[in-house]
Amino acid sequence: MTTNKRTLLCAGLTATAAPAAKATGLAAAAKAGVAPSVAGDAVTAAAEDFGHLIHRKPQAVLKPASAADIAELMSWAASRGLRVAARGQGHSVFGRVMAEGGVVLDMTSMRTIHDVQPDRISVDAGATWSAVLDAALPHGLTPPVLTNYLELSVGGTLVVGGIGPTTLRYGMQTDNVLALDVVTGDGRQLTCSPNSNPDLFDAIRAGLGQCGIITRATLRLVPAPQRVRRFNLFYADLRSLTADQRTVLTDGRFDQLQGAILPDGAGAWRYQLEGAVHHDGQAAPDNDAVLAGLSDQRSAAVISDLTYSEDLSAFARLESLLRSNGQWFHPHPWLLTFLRGSNAEQLAGDILAELNNSDVGPFGRITYYPMFTKALHTPLVRMPDESVAFPFNLIRIPASKDAAKADQMVAGNRVVYKRLRDAGGILYPVSAFPMSQNDWKDHFGPRWSLLRDAKQRYDPLATLTPGYTMF
C-alpha cells in the first residue's frame, strides 16, 4: 500500500481509495449508501485479540494512511450507525478493540517516526514502543516509562495508561505525553495538549478510546541510562517480600521496581523482588550497599549487569518461548488491579491462599509491588486514595487451550475484582471480565462526569470503541 492510499479489505477483494477529494473506495460507498459485506483474513484477525476469549467479527477492516482517512471513515460510519474501533497490535484481552458488525481501523498502517528532538519525539499512533526506542536511543534518549512488553502500539497504551518499572518515578506513559493529534468520534481532526483543547487531552489519555482516535503523539524523552544493574531477590513469604518492597520504595535505592509471586511448579509460590539501578559503566553500583538491610534469601539472588537495550529485551525472550510452546496463542484471562497500600499484604495473602499454580500457569505470575500514587497525574487513570498502591495482577498463561477452564478464570476474575473493589482496590482496565455501565461509573468515580461530558461533545452518537460496553 502506498503512503497516499488506504485499503478497505472486503468480500475477499481489495478496494483502493485515493485521497478524500476523490469519490472512490470508501467515499464512493458512502455516496452510494452501500456498506459492503466483508470476509477474508483481515476480518478474521480483527475478530480475535491476544485474550482469545471474545470473538466479534467486523463488517470491514480499514488500513488508513492518514488522519484524513480516519476522519472520512468516522463521518461515513456515524451516518450509518456503524461502530468503529482502532486496533494497534491487538493485545487487548477481552474484545475491547473489536467492533462487531462495524469497522476496525488497523493502525499498523500508520507507524511513522516523524521527529526526534532533545526532549521529545513525534510518532504515529500505530508505531510500537520498540520502534520509538530504536529511534530515540541513537540520540542517547528514551521515553521515561516503557511497558515490559515493547511490541505494543503507542496509541494502544496511551488509551489505558501504560505502566512500567519506572512508574514509581515518572508515572504512567500518559503522564509523559506532550501533545496528541486526534480524530474525534464525530470526525474532527484536532490537536490537544495541556494548553490546547485540554478537555479533550484529559479525555483521550486513559479514556479507553471513547472520545477519539489518536493518530499522532508527541512524547517526552529523557537521557537514557547506559547500563542497568538488575537485582532479582527471593523471599520466604509474602510478609518479608512486602516489608523489603516498602523499604526500597521509601529510600529510593532502585531506579526500577517491580515484584512478583511465581508458581514454583510444585504447588507452592516463590516471592520475588525485581529492582534495578541505572549507571554509566564508570561508577557501577556497589552490590553490598544496594542490598544493605534487606532480608532476602541472599544465596538465591540473581544479579546481572546489562546494557539498557539488553535489559529491555527480557520480555521478548519470554515471548519467543511462549510462541515456541504454543502458549502465546492460548487464552489469556488476565486481571489487573491496584490495591490500597494499607491492606495490600492482607488482601493479596487472602487471595493467594485460594489460588494454586494452575490458576496462573507455569509461565504466568502474580504481579505485586508498591508504587507512589503521587507520580501519577492523568485524570482518568484511577488509583486508590492513598499515597502508596500495589499493582496486583493475575497474569494467567494457561498451559492448555481449554475453553471451559478459561471461562472459569474469567468468572473468577469478576469475583476477585468485586472483592478487591469492596476493599478499596481499583481496576486497571486491561482485564478479562465483562463490565456494565454501572461498573464503569463506579470505576471512574468522581471522574465519570469528565468522560461522560467529553463523550457527548466529541462522540455524541457513541460510534467509538464499543468493546467496553460503556455508553
Regions found by a protein language model. Give the residues of each.
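Short glycine/threonine-rich loop-to-helix capping motif typified by GTGT followed
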Residues: 18, 267-269, 315-326, 373-386, ...
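Structural signature of FAD isoalloxazine-binding scaffolds in flavoprotein oxidoreductases
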Residues: 63, 93-114, 166-186, 213-217
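N-terminal secretory signal peptides and thylakoid transit peptides that target proteins
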Residues: 1-15
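C-terminal segment of N-terminal export signals and the immediately downstream linker at the start
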Residues: 1-2, 20-59, 65-68, 72-75, ...
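Activity-critical C-terminal alpha-helical subdomain
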Residues: 320-324, 333, 421-471
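Substrate-recognition/cap regions that form aromatic- and gly/pro-loop-enriched pockets
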Residues: 327-434, 442-444
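C-terminal substrate-binding/cap subdomain adjacent to the FAD-binding core in PCMH-type
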Residues: 13, 178-346, 362
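Glycine-rich N-terminal segment of FAD-binding domains in flavoprotein oxidoreductases
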Residues: 50-147, 161
